[in-house]
Amino acid sequence: MPLGHIMRLDLEKIALEYIVPCLHEVGFCYLDNFLGEVVGDCVLERVKQLHYNGALRDGQLAGPRAGVSKRHLRGDQITWIGGNEEGCEAINFLLSLIDRLVLYCGSRLGKYYVKERSKAMVACYPGNGTGYVRHVDNPNGDGRCITCIYYLNKNWDAKLHGGVLRIFPEGKSFVADVEPIFDRLLFSWSDRRNPHEVQPSYATRYAMTVWYFDAEERAEAKKKFRNLTRKTESALAKD
């Protein structure tokens, strides 16, 4: 969906007439040319600086192998950005626009009530066939309901470079291949409706992801975590 210059964006219209219907009908959608060349370049340059300065670390697996680095399963390198850090003005601007889009979606997202989101996860697949095996962002009710990914890869040719995000929409007879091209913004449900994988990348591949939380599910997840922590500490104390 080409959007043109950022100053002409009608974010509310995009949210209500495009994002909301697409999420409910197919579970995902994307916007192309979201920031425009100039602002998108500023985001890309900052991400490259983070990469070249050694700020990125191997991505970790969640679930039963939480905290474990398995490069053959997940090959990205990541760091977390709030947007207020020095030199991250363009990233902060991007995040503010995504926030507004999600805000405009509002109650039309169904059962979800979004009050907060994660920091931005800056990710780099360094090439050499690195990818991320099929998985679900939120399989166990941790509160994440919407995944937003902003891609930063100029002159990307999926036939040469790979790196396609393949989505396996639940209950659908098709798969969806999303190429990680520069200035593309993807929205999708975070739960089991959208299993997905990052196919092997043969060139440096950059992306930035934020997750929006449903307030009730997030509060319940935090409560369960606190209870588990207390039980673990109590068991260790008895030993």
From Swiss-Prot:
InterPro entries: HIF_prolyl_hydroxylases, Oxoglu/Fe-dep_dioxygenase_dom, Pro_4_hyd_alph, Pro_4_hyd_alph_FE2OG_OXY
Keyword set, alphabetical order: Apoptosis, Cytoplasm, Dioxygenase, DNA damage, Iron, Metal-binding, Nucleus, Oxidoreductase, Ubl conjugation, Vitamin C
Residues that bind 2-oxoglutarate: R205
GO MF terms, alphabetically ordered: 2-oxoglutarate-dependent dioxygenase activity; ferrous iron binding; hypoxia-inducible factor-proline dioxygenase activity; L-ascorbic acid binding; peptidyl-proline 4-dioxygenase activity; peptidyl-proline dioxygenase activity
Known EC number: 1.14.11.-, 1.14.11.29
Domain Fe2OG dioxygenase: 116-214
Gene Ontology CC: cytoplasm; nucleus
Positions of the UniProt region annotated as Required for interaction with ADRB2: 88-104
Region called Beta(2)beta(3) 'finger-like' loop, residue ranges: 62-73
Binding site for Fe cation: H135, D137, H196
Stored PROSITE patterns: FE2OG_OXY (PS51471)
Record's note on what induces expression: By PDGF and angiotensin II in aortic smooth muscle cells. By deprivation of NGF in neuronal cell cultures. Induced during coronary heart ligation.
Tissue: Highly expressed in vascular smooth muscle. Moderately expressed in esophagus, stomach, small bowel and aorta. Low levels in tail and kidney. Expression also in pheochromocytoma cell line PC-12.
UniProt KW Transport keyword: no
Cofactor or coenzyme needed: Fe(2+); L-ascorbate
BP-aspect Gene Ontology terms: apoptotic process; cellular response to hypoxia; cellular response to leukemia inhibitory factor; DNA damage response; regulation of cell population proliferation; regulation of neuron apoptotic process
Cofactor note: Binds 1 Fe(2+) ion per subunit.
Domain of life, per lineage: Eukaryota
Compartments where located: Nucleus; Cytoplasm
SMART domains: P4Hc
Subcellular location, principal: nucleus
Reactions mediated catalytically: L-prolyl-[protein] + 2-oxoglutarate + O2 = trans-4-hydroxy-L-prolyl-[protein] + succinate + CO2; L-prolyl-[hypoxia-inducible factor alpha subunit] + 2-oxoglutarate + O2 = trans-4-hydroxy-L-prolyl-[hypoxia-inducible factor alpha subunit] + succinate + CO2
Quaternary structure note: Interacts with ADRB2; the interaction hydroxylates ADRB2 facilitating its ubiquitination by the VHL-E3 ligase complex. Interacts with PAX2; the interaction targets PAX2 for destruction. Interacts with PKM; the interaction hydroxylates PKM in hypoxia. Interacts with WDR83; the interaction leads to almost complete elimination of HIF-mediated reporter activity. Interacts with BCL2 (via its BH4 domain); the interaction disrupts the BAX-BCL4 complex inhibiting the anti-apoptotic activity of BCL2.
Domain commentary: The Beta(2)beta(3) 'finger-like' loop domain is important for substrate (HIFs' CODD/NODD) selectivity.
The protein's role, per its UniProt record: Prolyl hydroxylase that mediates hydroxylation of proline residues in target proteins, such as PKM, TELO2, ATF4 and HIF1A. Target proteins are preferentially recognized via a LXXLAP motif. Cellular oxygen sensor that catalyzes, under normoxic conditions, the post-translational formation of 4-hydroxyproline in hypoxia-inducible factor (HIF) alpha proteins. Hydroxylates a specific proline found in each of the oxygen-dependent degradation (ODD) domains (N-terminal, NODD, and C-terminal, CODD) of HIF1A. Also hydroxylates HIF2A. Has a preference for the CODD site for both HIF1A and HIF2A.
Name listed for the protein in its UniProt record: Prolyl hydroxylase EGLN3
